Amino acid sequence: MSEVRIRPRQVLILIIVFLVVLMMVHRNGKRTCQGPEYLQAMFVQGDTLPTIYAVTPTYPRPAQKAELTRLSHLFMLLPHLHWIIVEDTNATTPLVRNLLDRAGLEKRSTLLNIKTPSEFKLKGKDPNWIKPRGVEQRNLALAWLRNHVDVDRHSIVFFMDDDNSYSTELFAEMSKIERGRVGVWPVGLVGGLMVERPLLTEDGTKVTGFNAAWRPERPFPIDMAAFAISMDLFIRNPQATFSYEVQRGYQESEILRHLTTRDQLQPLANRCTDVLVWHTRTEKTKLAAEEALLKKGQRSDGGMEV
C-alpha cells in the first residue's frame, strides 16, 4: 500500500479552513443584535433576565391591528418579554391570532378573552375616561399569571396599553426591578403635563411624592404606564385586583395599595429623569367614505384583513 504524504502547507490550509468553519458555526449559533449597548446586552442575556409579562387589553376597532402591529415590534426585539393579550370579545379573534403568528410570537405570547359587562361599556360619544376600562381583561390576566407562572423564578408584570408609545430602553430599566418591589419612572404627555414623574430624595433612592397636577391627593397619582410589579407580590397578595368600584383615576392606586407603599417604590430611569414611555392616543379613525360604501352593500376591504 502506497504511503500518503501531507505537506506542511496542506496541513496549514486544512487548519485555516477548519478554524474559519468553526468561527462561522459559532457566529451563526450566537445571538447577535445591532443597536445601543443596553439592547445588545438584553439580547445576549435574554435567558438570564427576569421574564416581563406585558398585559395588553384590546378590543375590536378599525385601528386595532395597526396598534398591535406597532407593539409587536417591541416583542420581536426583546427576547425576555411575554405578551399577554386579552381581547374584549366572546372568543379570541382570527385578527389577533394571525398577528401573533406573522410576528413569530406564538411561543412568547398568551391570548385570552373576556367580555366587559354591558353596563361598563362606553356608548356612542362617551368620553373614554367616563368608565373604567380594561378591568375584566387585566384581572383575567392576573388570574392566568397566578396559575401559570413559576413562583421560584423572578418575573415582572407590566400593564401595557395598546395605544401608548414605548422605548425599548424602558424594558431594560424594568429588568432591574428587585423581588418584592414595584419599579416607577416618568411618563410623558399625561395628566395635563409634559411629564408626570415621581419626586425623589436627594440621593435618588426613595420616592417622596409626585408632581401630578390632576387629583394629586390620590394614594399613587401615577399613570398605568408608570410602574411595573414583581410577580411575587401578586402571589403573596391574592386580593390584589382591579375594581369597578373605585373613583375615576384610582385604578392605579387600587392595585398598588394591596402591594406596596410609597416608601417601598423603586425609582428607575436614571433617578426618574429619563422619559421612556409616552401616554399617546391614536386619533379616532374617520371612515365616512367607508360608511357610504357599506350603505350600498360594498366595502373597500372585501376579503382583506386591515
Swiss-Prot record:
Glycans are attached at residue 90. It comes from the Eukaryota. It is found in: Golgi apparatus membrane. It is an enzyme of class 2 (transferase). Residues 30-306 are lumenal. Its cofactor is Mn(2+). Keywords: Glycoprotein, Golgi apparatus, Manganese, Membrane, Metal-binding, Signal-anchor, Transferase, Transmembrane, Transmembrane helix. Mn(2+) binds at residue 163. Its EC number is 2.4.1.135. It is a single-pass type II membrane protein. It catalyses: 3-O-(beta-D-galactosyl-(1->3)-beta-D-galactosyl-(1->4)-beta-D-xylosyl)-L-seryl-[protein] + UDP-alpha-D-glucuronate = 3-O-(beta-D-GlcA-(1->3)-beta-D-Gal-(1->3)-beta-D-Gal-(1->4)-beta-D-Xyl)-L-seryl-[protein] + UDP + H(+). Signal peptide: none annotated. Belongs to the glycosyltransferase 43 family. Involved in the biosynthesis of L2/HNK-1 carbohydrate epitope on both glycolipids and glycoproteins. Shows strict specificity for Gal-beta-1,3-Gal-beta-1,4-Xyl, exhibiting negligible incorporation into other galactoside substrates. This is Galactosylgalactosylxylosylprotein 3-beta-glucuronosyltransferase I. It comes from Drosophila melanogaster (Fruit fly).
